[in-house]
Amino acid sequence: MKHIPFESSKYYHIYNRGNNKENIFIETQNYIYFLKLMTKHLLPIASIYSYCLLSNHFHIVLRIKDENHLPEKMQIGKTKIHQPFSNMFNAYTKAINKKYKRQGSLFQ
C-alpha cells in the first residue's frame, strides 16, 4: 500500500489488489478472517462506511476518527496512524502464506 499521510477527521478510499493480479481471497474463511482483522485493527482508529471484498482485490471507504477519539498511542506525535493498516495487511499476508504454503508479497 502506498504510504500517504493519514489525517484525523478525513475520509479515505483504501484499495489494494493481489500481487501479479493473483487472488487474495481463496475461500470463504479468508473473507471472514480479513473482516475480523479489519475490526481488530481499523475500528479503533476509523469509522468504516463501506467495503467490497473481491477475489483479487478490495476497497474500503473509511473516515479516520477525530484526534481526541483516537487511542492515545495513535495521536499526533506518537505512533503513525498508518501502523494499524500495516499490521492488518501483514497479519493477513502471514496467515495466507502459512495456510497455502506460499511465500512473499500477497499485495501489489
Predicted regions and their residues:
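Short catalytic/metal-binding and nucleic-acid-binding patches
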Residues: M1-Q108
